[in-house]
Each structure stands twice: as C-alpha cells, then as structure tokens.
UniProtKB/Swiss-Prot annotation:
It catalyses: a quinone + NADH + 5 H(+)(in) = a quinol + NAD(+) + 4 H(+)(out). This is NADH-quinone oxidoreductase subunit K. Keywords: Cell inner membrane, Cell membrane, Membrane, NAD, Quinone, Translocase, Transmembrane, Transmembrane helix, Transport. It holds the Pfam family Oxidored_q2. It is an enzyme of class 7 (translocase). The chain crosses the membrane at residues 5-25, 30-50, 62-82. One of its GO terms (biological process) is ATP synthesis coupled electron transport. It is found in: Cell inner membrane.
Length: 101
C-alpha cells in the first residue's frame, strides 16, 4: 500500500487546523508560538508532498526558506515573551495590556 498525495494533504490539513485551534483558544503566549510553529510545519509537509508528487525539488527548497523564517520568528517571539515576562511576571495574553499608559 502506497501513501498517496491525498493522505499527506489530509494530515497536513489536520495539523494546520490543530495549530489554528491552538492559536484561537489558548491564552499562553508560549503555547500560541508553538501553535504557529505547528501551522508552519503543516505547510512544510504540504510543500514536501507536492514536491514528491510532481517530482520537482522546488517544494523541498521552499521548505528550507520556511524553516529559516520560522526559526527567526521563534527567536524574536521568544525574546518578546521573555521581555514581557520580566516586566509583567506573566505570559498570559489576557493579562498583558501594552496600550494602557
């Protein structure tokens, strides 16, 4: 039994939806960043699946660019979360109000 493109895309859609639900329902900044990374990994899975299905390496090269952007996003996001924790002593998004003077 061979795994077809539809199976990869279904798995990718499931992982992406799990990431979206994590972003929409969680209030912890670290969990939100992890959910965003989950969404990016779902996109990477789709790129690799299409690359394999079309016998083209362009999708696999795109994954490296997405991984680079994801690493930069994680580094900047984690730095922001650490800064907020040092100032507000919480990583809960509801308790952080930056617009309040």
């Amino acid at each position: 039994m061979e795994i077809e493109l539809g199976h990869y895309l279904a798995l990718s859609a499931f992982v992406f939806i799990c990431g979206v639900l994590g972003v929409l329902t969680r209030r912890n900044a670290i969990i939100i960043f992890m959910s965003i990374e989950l969404m990016l990994n779902a996109v990477n899975l789709s790129f690799v699946a299409f690359s394999h299905y079309l016998s083209d390496i362009a999708g696999q090269m795109m994954v490296f660019f997405v991984m680079t952007v994801a690493a930069a996003e994680a580094a900047v996001g984690l730095a922001i979360v650490i800064s907020l924790f040092r100032n507000k002593q919480t990583v809960n998004i509801d308790e952080i109000n930056l617009l309040k003077g």
